[in-house]
Amino acid sequence: MLISNAIRLQLKRLHIHNSVFIKYSFYEPNRKRDLDNIAGVAHKFIQDSLVKCGVLENDGWGNITGFSDQFFLDRYNPRIEIVIQEEGE
């Protein structure tokens, strides 16, 4: 619910009909969690929420061509930022 609400606030009524590449930037408060544990769960929930909110039609192979992950430390403002790059039109 929190992810869907954040998407609705940030992306308003955006609807993407082409395939996309998603860049994830994870800002963690410390180095306690394994990188794959951070990214794996986040990909699932964020991509499902993008579909639920109507930003993406689906989150299958034909809709998301790939993604990349970057990890940073930010003790005071942990967050996840995503950039959605729409591929050819």
Enumerate the predicted regions with their spans.
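Catalytic phosphate/metal-binding cores of nucleic-acid and nucleotide-processing enzymes, i.e., regions
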Residues: 1-89
